[in-house]
Amino acid sequence: MDEQPRLMHSHAGVGMAGHPGLSQHLQDGAGGTEGEGGRKQDIGDILQQIMTITDQSLDEAQARKHALNCHRMKPALFNVLCEIKEKTVLSIRGAQEEEPTDPQLMRLDNMLLAEGVAGPEKGGGSAAAAAAAAASGGAGSDNSVEHSDYRAKLSQIRQIYHTELEKYEQACNEFTTHVMNLLREQSRTRPISPKEIERMVSIIHRKFSSIQMQLKQSTCEAVMILRSRFLDARRKRRNFNKQATEILNEYFYSHLSNPYPSEEAKEELAKKCGITVSQVSNWFGNKRIRYKKNIGKFQEEANIYAAKTAVTATNVSAHGSQANSPSTPNSAGSSSSFNMSNSGDLFMSVQSLNGDSYQGAQVGANVQSQVDTLRHVISQTGGYSDGLAASQMYSPQGISANGGWQDATTPSSVTSPTEGPGSVHSDTSN
């Protein structure tokens, strides 16, 4: 409707005066009694009515539009407008090829389908939650609670996405329908081809597609933030408690020459730490890899655990010596038998300190002095009973001559006091 006044102003004189069909209509309408002034007056009234349509109310506009469509000069006016359009080629374009789908929009659609946000709801959020659970690992009630929270949050994101997408589609359809109806209505007065209507619809959809892309992009960002938060939280919760870490580190550094626990040792460690055997195996595998990659960094930690083991063994030895020699507590040459309540733990400590288990670790000077003190205390106690090997907690392993790992023999060299003081030996170096 905006083009009508401009077109009529620019081409009224030429088109309407020079058009033969329109002249014939004017002559027929005016009759023989009316002159040139009457025809100009009639044309001026039509143009004035067209100019004032935009300023009228809806009811008045509908009445004027109906009067215009029923006017006897309406066909002549339409023919003039068609000729003007053909001459000036206004809004005439060839059939445009269908534009390819935006690759960014395709990536967003694929991501939303993979995360279970788009597409059918059945199994979508559950599948995404199961994938997140498999990636994070772990088990237990805490893990199930986290998965429930993840599914709830994902379902909320999905609901918001579909609600906004429905609003978007509804607004796009309503606006497209309104424009198409408006163009069809205007096509009764001015020439508008169906191809031009289709082109206008494609322009509207292209404008709305930017809104759709923004909605999908924000939804994908929300899903990624949700996944990162839950995966990070699960990764933090997978850390063992301090007591379990201490137990595993003590065993690792006391068997540093061969940190490969047997199945029995793994089961015992799993019971002590309150974890599964597979978690114990995974922990030792990761610990060996980290230790090999950065030996210098873990050397200080190894020295700390070695000193702690030495102090514990010294206290146990002194306590056992006093318990077995109550009449002569200060006797240094006592050859009485020395029995321990926890001989397996002490043997593990003595084996590590008196043998070759730490020869590759370069124990510090302060730790070496504690080792010498421990050996002196052992020489004062006289010896150990032969039942020590039977109560051994872990199976020590050694390195064979060809460089492979093998089980060490039972430490039969732990003998009675008949061999003399300080006769404790370790067989882990075979």
UniProtKB/Swiss-Prot annotation:
User: What residue spans carry the Low complexity bias annotation?
Assistant: 323-338
Record-annotated site: Required for binding to the NFIL3 promoter:
N286
Q: Where is this region: PBC-A?
A: 45-124
UniProt keywords, alphabetically: Activator, Chromosomal rearrangement, Developmental protein, Differentiation, Disease variant, DNA-binding, Homeobox, Nucleus, Proto-oncogene, Repressor, Sexual differentiation, Steroidogenesis, Transcription, Transcription regulation
Places the protein is found: Nucleus
The segment annotated Disordered runs over: 1-40, 317-338, 395-430
The cross-references to PROSITE patterns, in alphabetical order and at most eight, read: HOMEOBOX_1, HOMEOBOX_2, PBC
Site (Breakpoint for translocation to form TCF3-PBX1 oncogene) at T88, V89
The free-text domain remark for this protein reads: The homeobox is required for PBX1 nuclear localization and for transcriptional activation of NFIL3.
The annotated subunit structure for this chain is: Forms a heterodimer with MEIS1 which binds DNA. The PBX1-MEIS1 heterodimer binds a cAMP-responsive sequence in CYP17. It also binds a consensus region in the SOX3 promoter. PBX1 forms heterotrimers with MEIS1 and a number of HOX proteins including HOXA9, HOXD4, HOXD9 and HOXD10. Forms heterodimers with HOXA1, HOXA5, HOXB7 and HOXB8 which bind the 5'-TGATTGAT-3' consensus sequence. Also forms heterodimers with HOXA5, HOXB7, HOXB8, HOXC8 and HOXD4 which bind the 5'-ATCAATCAA-3' consensus sequence. Interacts with PBXIP1. Interacts with TLX1. Interacts with FOXC1. Interacts with MN1.
Job description of the protein: Transcription factor which binds the DNA sequence 5'-TGATTGAT-3' as part of a heterodimer with HOX proteins such as HOXA1, HOXA5, HOXB7 and HOXB8. Binds to the DNA sequence 5'-TGATTGAC-3' in complex with a nuclear factor which is not a class I HOX protein. Has also been shown to bind the DNA sequence 5'-ATCAATCAA-3' cooperatively with HOXA5, HOXB7, HOXB8, HOXC8 and HOXD4. Acts as a transcriptional activator of PF4 in complex with MEIS1. Also activates transcription of SOX3 in complex with MEIS1 by binding to the 5'-TGATTGAC-3' consensus sequence.
Q: Mind telling me what this protein is named? A: Pre-B-cell leukemia transcription factor 1
Q: Name the source organism.
A: Homo sapiens (Human)
